């Protein structure tokens, strides 16, 4: 399955290569700063105004870009340095910020250091997330939340042989969201409910690092705490709105807190010698999780009679996790390297839960559930790298993994004697793979790599797990002072046994070019092509009058993604800098022009066809101009266009939009 995700991540990496229009990467010159006692202070601030104009689906725009109007501190930097490196309380303070004020994506990085005594690093990020959810649940699922992430790390005696570490991290998410609840039975309608998202994660760290006799030993103690206290309520009285369903939801409340903790240990031993190296790591986490749910609903059922429903759920679980890695490296000669790595992991989850339900005065009883999941994995890999000559080298390896999964499922009905039932399932598999490659360097600036891998699994755990797979790939790169060129290709096949009827195939092409013939001109371009197709057997219940088993359909998903980036930079008489860029991502799908192929009369097949390919186009040209007013002041202006279009739309709902965004700012350095 991981091989299927590789093309998606590769395309995401290509899109990330495009520059954003603001803040400007240009600087205001080399500021000398101002003296303050034994310190020198330098500052740089870019303040400006953003604007945007959106047409089409504004919800999709907010989900993808989300830039609005208003004043911004687009970027800022502040630094204090000791003149002689021996300040009283600190020797260095640096602060860098981006998007503070009203941008949906904001960040700040702070560094404080006193040479040889302490080092403090802090990072803070804020991201406003909006998900309109209009393509599912009739538009009744959406989220408008903010996530704040911060990390703090303090190192005492950072340059000594014995160092001490303290750390703290925090991740919070809050904001309104909309969901649905089904009432008052399994055949009832779904009604909108409002939630107030409140999620929080905290981690505390302390540890030490020792250097002795060429070894580095690290030990760290961690405490992780997570809680989700998101309530849900209805907003007034909501009716089903159909003549055949008289259900009315008059009142709804749900409380579902989840609290967990994960204290753990981390130990690491590392050394690198002339002929050998060692890296050993051991981690243990003792996790525990407690949850409860109290839900009540009041109204009228589908037949017009008064109805009320109350559900109470509670439980707890333990999650111990042990993992160890040992990597040994051997360098008998300068041209030969052996690396062997052994990893062991043991994950377990077990706990009890209870479910009780009362429906319109009737006690439907209590059910007690027990679940246990244990996964033990052992992996070993040996890799050899041999450089036969300066221009040619070979590498190969053998990888082996053994996994065992055990599941216990049990339940009890306290109201009935001898109702306890336990089912135990055990399954395991072994994966063996071999890889080989050659590295060529016919001349100093040019390198070529070819590699391939073949893998076999005796017992895939799921229908989409790797069975018999093979990959082939190559990469060529040319690097000179003024030009850099690279191209790569990778192909992956995964064949399953005949009874699973699943297969997948992916191909990836990539090319990059960078050219800087003059100091005042540079060009960067990239192209990425990813093809993915997967085929699987489907079995489900559906029918116009009554549901029956449908076993004649297949899921065939086809994606053909083309992504390209182009950026050109001009420096005009050392007075101005102009950047022009263009980015496009286009998925052509399987090439069809309509949602369902011509002649499709089966309504189920037509529905499946509509979601088995998703052709779309996303493009974003931009232009940015930065003019130097004085050695310390620059005026900046930029424009960026976003265009998103779906050929079919998901379930006939189109989320197309186009947006014009831009900014103007002043950068001041001193």
Show where each model-derived region lies.
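Initiator methionine at the very start of the polypeptide chain
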Residues: 1-2, 17-18
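Sec-dependent signal peptide recognition
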Residues: 2-8
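Hydrophobic h-region of N-terminal signal peptides that target proteins for export
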Residues: 8-17
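Gram-negative and organellar
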Residues: 18-37, 41, 50-670
């Amino acid at each position: 399955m991981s091989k299927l995700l590789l093309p998606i991540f590769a395309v995401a990496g290509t899109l990330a290569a495009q520059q954003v229009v603001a803040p400007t990467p240009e600087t205001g010159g080399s500021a000398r700063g101002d003296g303050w006692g034994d310190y020198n202070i330098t500052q740089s601030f870019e303040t400006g105004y953003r604007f945007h104009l959106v047409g089409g689906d504004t919800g999709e725009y907010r989900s993808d870009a989300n830039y609005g109007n208003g004043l911004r501190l687009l970027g800022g930097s502040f630094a204090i340095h000791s003149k002689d490196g021996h300040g009283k309380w600190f020797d260095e303070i640096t602060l860098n910020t981006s998007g503070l004020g009203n941008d949906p994506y904001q960040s700040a990085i702070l560094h404080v250091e006193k040479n040889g005594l302490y080092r403090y690093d802090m990072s803070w990020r804020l991201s406003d997330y909006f998900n309109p959810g209009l393509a599912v649940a009739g538009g009744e699922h959406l989220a408008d939340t903010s996530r704040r992430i911060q990390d703090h790390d303090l190192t005492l005696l950072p340059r000594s042989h014995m160092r001490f570490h303290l750390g703290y991290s925090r991740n919070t998410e809050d904001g309104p969201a909309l969901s649905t609840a089904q009432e008052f039975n399994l055949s009832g309608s779904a009604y909108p409910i409002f939630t107030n998202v409140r999620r929080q994660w905290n981690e505390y760290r302390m540890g030490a690092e020792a250097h002795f006799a060429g070894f580095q030993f690290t030990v760290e103690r961690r405490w992780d705490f997570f809680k989700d206290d998101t309530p849900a309520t209805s907003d007034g009285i909501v009716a089903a709105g159909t003549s055949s369903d008289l259900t009315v939801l008059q009142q709804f409340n749900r409380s579902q807190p989840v609290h967990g903790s994960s204290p753990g240990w981390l130990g690491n031993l590392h050394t690198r010698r002339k002929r050998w190296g060692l890296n050993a790591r051991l981690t243990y986490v003792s996790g525990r999780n407690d949850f409860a749910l109290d839900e009540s609903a009041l109204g009228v059922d589908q037949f017009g009679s008064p109805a009320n429903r109350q559900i109470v759920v509670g439980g707890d679980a333990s999650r111990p996790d042990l993992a160890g890695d040992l990597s040994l490296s051997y360098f008998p000669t300068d041209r030969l390297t052996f690396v062997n790595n052994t990893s062991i992991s043991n994950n377990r989850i077990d706990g009890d839960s209870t479910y009780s339900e009362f429906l319109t005065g009737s006690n439907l009883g209590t059910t007690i559930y027990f679940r246990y999941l244990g996964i033990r994995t052992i992996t070993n890999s040996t890799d050899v790298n041999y450089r036969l000559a300066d221009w040619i080298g070979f590498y190969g390896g053998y990888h082996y993994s053994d996994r065992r999964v055990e599941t216990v499922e049990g339940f009890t009905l306290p109201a009935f004697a001898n109702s306890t039932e336990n089912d135990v399932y055990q399954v395991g598999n072994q994966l063996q793979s071999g890889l080989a490659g050659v590295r060529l360097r016919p001349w100093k600036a040019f390198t070529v790599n070819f590699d391939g891998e073949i893998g076999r699994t005796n017992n895939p755990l799921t229908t989409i797990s790797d069975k018999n797979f093979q990959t082939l790939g190559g990469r060529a790169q040319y690097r000179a002072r003024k030009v850099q060129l690279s191209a790569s290709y990778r192909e992956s096949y995964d064949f399953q046994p005949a009874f699973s009827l699943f297969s997948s195939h992916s191909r990836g092409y990539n090319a990059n070019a960078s050219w800087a013939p003059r100091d005042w001109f540079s060009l960067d371009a990239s192209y990425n092509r990813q093809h993915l197709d997967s085929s699987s057997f489907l079995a489900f219940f559906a029918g116009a009058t009554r549901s029956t088993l449908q076993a004649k359909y297949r899921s065939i998903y086809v994606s053909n993604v083309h992504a390209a980036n182009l950026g050109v930079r001009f420096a005009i008489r050392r007075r101005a800098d102009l950047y022009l860029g263009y980015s496009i991502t286009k998925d052509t799908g399987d090439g069809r022009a309509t949602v369902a192929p011509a002649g499709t009369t089966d309504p189920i097949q037509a529905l499946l066809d509509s979601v088995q390919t998703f052709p779309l186009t996303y493009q974003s040209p931009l232009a940015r101009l930065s003019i130097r007013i004085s050695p310390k002041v620059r005026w900046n202006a930029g424009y960026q266009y976003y265009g998103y279009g779906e050929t079919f739309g998901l379930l006939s709902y189109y989320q197309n939009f186009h947006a014009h965004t831009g900014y103007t700012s002043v950068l001041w350095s001193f």
